[in-house]
Amino acid sequence: MTPQQTRRNDQRSIVPARTPRLRLKPKAPQSGYVDGAWWPRSEDLSVELPDLLAVLSVRLGRIDRVLYHLNAWVKAPRKLTTGGRTVRLDGYRLQPINTIEVLGLDGDRLTLLVVPSHTDAHDAHRTMMTAAQPHNAATVDGLLMISQRDRDIRTEASTAQECWESEGGTTASPRLAQLPG
């Protein structure tokens, strides 16, 4: 897939090539775990971010960093140039899954729930609208309707995979298996 290019309008602001599927809480003191929700079209962070960052820069100003969970996306570069600026992409295994944090250069930040790209449109819309309600304080798992049992199973599987990889095993991740060798 070829990345979509952002463009500048006459006022020198960045205009997304494709409008991101995004809902944000109104700008106010933080309430709840997330500041809104984003439903990307793919699991390729470097393809999805330019349009999202163009929209979020209206609220955050110049974007400095994006933090994400390593296992949630195909391998991403450490830096991404978008709109003529370089943004650091920092992947962590401890970053809460199904979230990204977008940090502005001035220290402002937004934590977004990431609705998996394969989610049914009706369910994704409902989840995004709920996450963007001003006083919604639901957890990420609550918003995505992930039970504690399911989360425990996913955590156990992820821990086992990380242990296997740290001992020299190759990853079983289907996203990593798709990358050219």
PLM regions with names:
Residues M1-Q4, N9-I14, R59, P174-G181:
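Short linear motifs embedded in intrinsically disordered, proline/glycine-rich low-complexity segments
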Residues P3, V74-G181:
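Helix-rich interaction surfaces within compact, conserved domain-sized segments
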Residues R7-Y33:
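N-terminal, Lys/Arg- and Ser/Thr-rich interaction peptides
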Residues R8-Q11, K25, L52-V55, R88-L89, ...:
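Intrinsically disordered, low-complexity boundary segments flanking structured domains
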Residues R12-S13, L24, L45, L52-V58, ...:
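A compositional/structural signature for long, glycine/proline-rich flexible linkers
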Residues V34-W38:
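Short hinge/gating elements
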Residues W39-A76, L80:
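Short, well-structured hydrophobic secondary-structure segments
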